[in-house]
Design a protein with these regions (language model features):
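ATP-dependent carboxylate-amine ligase
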Residues: 1-51, 64, 68, 86-89
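Phosphate-binding loop of NTP-binding sites
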Residues: 3, 23-29, 46, 59-63, ...
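Pocket-edge structural micro-motifs
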Residues: 11, 54, 112
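Short beta->alpha connector loops at strand-helix junctions that form conserved
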Residues: 35, 55-56, 94-95
Length: 152
């Protein structure tokens, strides 16, 4: 995937969104974002270097944004979404960005109604010892204390 410098997340505190933000932070990107409320997840992202605000206000958006990742949990009527759309800044759903990242990697997908996080965590644990991997787990896996595992 092409390197981008400045990525903005709308709904950065969500479990899937925060995993993507952590991935891009580790890759050396500048990460900015909005969420409705602070949480342990957003605090951890801020410790890692993300700039996050909790007020719907376009003045908190940095001057340079290469693209936006959003979750459908944030309505398209949100001031910031409207701003990005009006300024022709590319906006991608979380799932599309996950697809961009994984498109050039061997991939195992886990689907279903119940047990996806547990199953993904088990697969990650098994493969982690012998193979470098990138795993988006879908929840905070206790054995990794993370929702994303990135081996270099």
């Amino acid at each position: 995937m092409k390197h981008f410098d400045n990525i903005y997340f709308m709904g950065i505190g969500g479990i899937g969104m925060s995993a993507l933000a952590r991935y891009f932070l580790q890759a050396g990107n500048h990460i900015y974002g909005y969420d409705l409320t602070p949480s342990d997840i957003t605090a951890h992202l801020e410790e890692l270097g993300a700039t996050i605000h909790y007020v719907e206000n376009v003045e908190f958006i940095p001057e340079q944004v290469d693209f936006v990742v959003y979750t459908p949990a944030v309505p398209k009527t949100h001031q910031e979404y409207v701003y990005f759309e009006k300024n022709n800044i590319p906006i991608y759903k979380r799932s599309a960005v996950l697809g961009m990242i994984s498109s050039h990697l061997p991939t195992i997908g886990v689907a279903g109604t119940h047990g996806k996080t547990t199953t993904t965590s088990m697969i990650t644990t098994i493969l982690h010892d012998d193979h470098p991997l990138l795993a988006f787990i879908g929840g905070i896996a206790k054995n990794f204390n993370a929702n994303v595992v990135i081996d270099d």
